[in-house]
Amino acid sequence: MYPVHLLVLLAVCVSLLGASNIPPQPLNLYQFGNMIQCANHGRRPTQHYTDYGCYCGKGGSGTPVDELDRCCKTHDDCYTEAGKKGCYPKLTLYSWKCTGKAPTCNSKTGCKRTVCDCDATAAKCFAKAPYNNKNYNIDTKKRCQ
């Protein structure tokens, strides 16, 4: 083998080792976003739910500010329970379809079904709950104690 080939091979190996330290990205959040759009018939962009109240978005604490925020807390709790069963909700891809303008899970068993049910239930809850613009991008340090 030529020295240049060895250098290229070494560079690839080092790159792969570095990539193994990159944390995995939440893959199923794209699916969840599509479920939300299915349930609310595209009336509200998915990103409006990423920084709403005390529980919609990353993390969560305190008392939910309204019905929509309670949907997010319930979804967080569902993911926690799925994690206790050995599932990785943010990384679990599942099969579903939009029927009658509501998400329906096709995955039958295990983590795929559990996570799909968490997401479908939350998406339907979001569609029913009123959206209060005052609860978007709130000061969580003050309002979520």
From Swiss-Prot:
Residue ranges the record marks as coiled coil: none
* Keyword Transmembrane helix part of the UniProt annotation: no
Pfam families assigned to the protein according to its UniProt record, in alphabetical order: Phospholip_A2_1
Q: Which cell locations does it reside in?
A: Secreted
Active site positions? 75, 119
User: What does the record say about tissue specificity?
Assistant: Expressed by the venom gland.
| Catalytic activity, as annotated | a 1,2-diacyl-sn-glycero-3-phosphocholine + H2O = a 1-acyl-sn-glycero-3-phosphocholine + a fatty acid + H(+)
Q: What is its main location?
A: secreted
One Gene Ontology cellular component annotation held by this UniProt entry = extracellular region
A GO molecular-function descriptor: calcium-dependent phospholipase A2 activity
In the record, which residues are listed under signal peptide? 1-19
Q: What is its EC number?
A: 3.1.1.4
Identify the keywords attached in UniProt to this record, alphabetized: Calcium, Disulfide bond, Hemostasis impairing toxin, Hydrolase, Lipid degradation, Lipid metabolism, Metal-binding, Platelet aggregation inhibiting toxin, Secreted, Signal, Toxin
Q: Where does Ca(2+) bind?
A: 55, 57, 59, 76
Propeptide positions, renumbered to this chain?
A: 20-27
The cysteines joined by S-S bonds are: 38-98, 54-144, 56-72, 71-125, 78-118, 87-111, 105-116
The entry sums up its family as follows: Belongs to the phospholipase A2 family. Group I subfamily. D49 sub-subfamily.
Name it. Answer: Basic phospholipase A2 S11-61
Its source organism is Austrelaps superbus
